[in-house]
Swiss-Prot record:
This is Coronin-1C. Transmembrane segments: none annotated. InterPro entries: Coronin, DUF1899, WD40/YVTN_repeat-like_dom_sf, WD40_repeat_CS, WD40_repeat_dom_sf, WD40_rpt. It comes from Homo sapiens. The keyword ATP-binding does not apply. The keyword tRNA processing does not apply. Belongs to the WD repeat coronin family. PROSITE patterns: WD_REPEATS_1 (PS00678), WD_REPEATS_2 (PS50082), WD_REPEATS_REGION (PS50294). The gene is CORO1C. The modification N6-acetyllysine is found at residue 446.
């Protein structure tokens, strides 16, 4: 019987490493024993955790700063212990958070054009963990809300605008937390921990909504992330040390929707998820490949697409947000693969013959504008990401400076009702420069359209005149 091949526009996703001159060379990537990605990327900068004497440090390079990186290049170096995790703010491309073995979280403001001097003073230091902080994750839709998780088995959610810890989940995990993931609107988090449990938690109600014991039975680390439809995707190991991936419905976590066994490598599988295309990319630490799968509503739900393979193993991996991709090249993902001494971008494309904008590859995607202010989220409001179109390419706007306003310690009013100054001016205040830039951009786009229309009309006219000339000549 002839087998029917499943139709998918992503069956031919093609991975390609960039040329050597477009890599970031001579970087001493961190050797610390921790299963984070060691790299964070946005449309302006790539940040990489590096080896540093006398404390912890990471590099922040403008994307165009390729080639050999000088040993004296400025670093972000305020931590007194190794940096374990970094995460760019989704609402401000110049703000990055870092977690360290020194038990602190620091939030940094990077100058618009990158560093010219090493940065030692963070905008704010967040102190609340009693052991090293291995996870930092910004809220996807609320401005200034940052989550951190430490080896004290506690999750703290901060209002960065005031430097306050407003939620402390310190009694939900009996063992080390491997990772934490926000859902699409930031109302829930899911966690994977060393006790082999996957938990879905409502952080504001401080209660566990769903829980699965022994999601994967192996002893090695697991990962759990939320998908756009609310399901949870996990990676882990079987009792026989085979790597597994699984899909779960939080409303019924007795049995997985899908469970696949992959291979017997021992590297932790780091999942990177694109909610616009429903593709999950799995990058194993120590692997030399990236496997990718499409998640659909039809059995077997998790469909293997392809594998990008290279020669060198990866020490870590950065993943570019959708708004940083080149839509003209039909690029659907860009990874920043960390080698021992360099960072190598890898571009994933869907080959298309047409030069037109591919609407089916690029639905409206999460933009840089926050949907909520911090105090709105802490008061119980939820909002989906504010979407933008990539049809004309994404042009980064000017970011506002991060400002932190400390509360008066003597002020004893409940924190939940207090108003606070935030990283950016509230939405109601219009950024004049930004509006002017948008108006100019609209004018330019209208002018281009007008020129295109004129050219089309001229082409038609020339064609008619040529036909008339041909008749006369005949």
């Amino acid at each position: 019987m002839r087998r029917v091949v499943r139709q998918s526009k992503f069956r031919h996703v093609f991975g390609q490493a960039v040329k050597n001159d477009q890599c970031y060379d001579d970087i001493r990537v961190s050797r610390v024993t921790w299963d984070s990605s060691f790299c964070a990327v946005n449309p302006r900068f790539v940040a990489i955790i590096i080896e540093a004497s006398g404390g912890g440090a990471f590099l922040v390079l403008p994307l165009h700063k390729t080639g050999r990186i000088d040993k004296s290049y400025p670093t972000v170096c305020g931590h007194t212990g190794p940096v374990l995790d970094i995460d760019w703010c989704p609402h401000n491309d110049q703000v990055i958070a870092s977690g360290s073995e020194d038990c602190t979280v620091m939030v940094w403001q990077i100058p618009e054009n990158g560093l010219t001097l090493s940065l030692t003073e963070p905008v704010v230091i967040l102190e609340g963990h009693s052991k090293r902080v291995g996870i930092v994750a910004w809220h996807p839709t609320a401005r200034n809300v940052l989550l951190s998780a430490g080896c004290d088995n506690a999750i703290i959610i901060w209002n960065v605008g005031t430097g306050e810890a407003l939620i402390n989940l310190d009694d939900m995990h009996s063992d080390m937390i491997y990772n934490v993931s926000w859902n699409r609107n930031g109302s829930l988090i899911c966690t994977a921990s060393k006790d082999k449990k996957v938990r879905v938690i409502d952080p504001r109600k401080q209660e566990i909504v769903a829980e699965k014991e022994k999601a994967h039975e192996g002893a090695r680390p697991m990962r759990a992330i939320f998908l756009a439809d609310g399901n949870v995707f996990t990676t882990g190991f079987s009792r026989m040390s085979e790597r597994q991936l699984a899909l779960w419905n939080p409303k019924n976590m007795q049995e997985p929707i899908a469970l696949h066994e992959m291979d017997t490598s021992n590297g932790v599988l780091l999942p990177f998820y694109d909610p616009d295309t429903s593709i999950i990319y799995l990058c194993g630490k120590g692997d030399s490949s990236i496997r990718y799968f499409e998640i659909t509503d039809e059995s077997p739900y998790v469909h293997y697409l392809n594998t990008f393979s290279s020669k060198e193993p990866q020490r870590g991996m950065g993943y570019m947000p959708k708004r940083g991709l080149d839509v003209n090249k039909c690029e659907i993902a860009r990874f920043f693969k960390l080698h021992e001494r360099k960072c190598e971008p890898i571009i994933m494309t869907v080959p298309r013959k047409s030069d037109l904008f591919q609407d089916d590859l690029y639905p409206d995607t999460a933009g840089p504008e926050a949907a909520l202010e911090a105090e709105e989220w802490f008061e119980g409001k939820n909002a989906d990401p504010i979407l933008i179109s990539l049809k004309h390419g994404y042009i980064p706007g000017k970011n506002r400076d991060l400002k932190v306003v400390k509360k008066n310690i003597l002020d004893s009013k409940p924190t939940a009702n207090k108003k606070c100054d935030l990283i950016s001016i509230p939405k109601k205040t219009t950024d004049t420069a930004s509006v002017q830039n948008e108006a100019k951009l609209d004018e330019i786009l209208k002018e281009i359209k007008s020129i295109k229309d004129t050219i089309c009309n001229q082409d038609e006219r020339i064609s008619k005149l040529e036909q008339q000339m041909a008749k006369i000549a005949a």
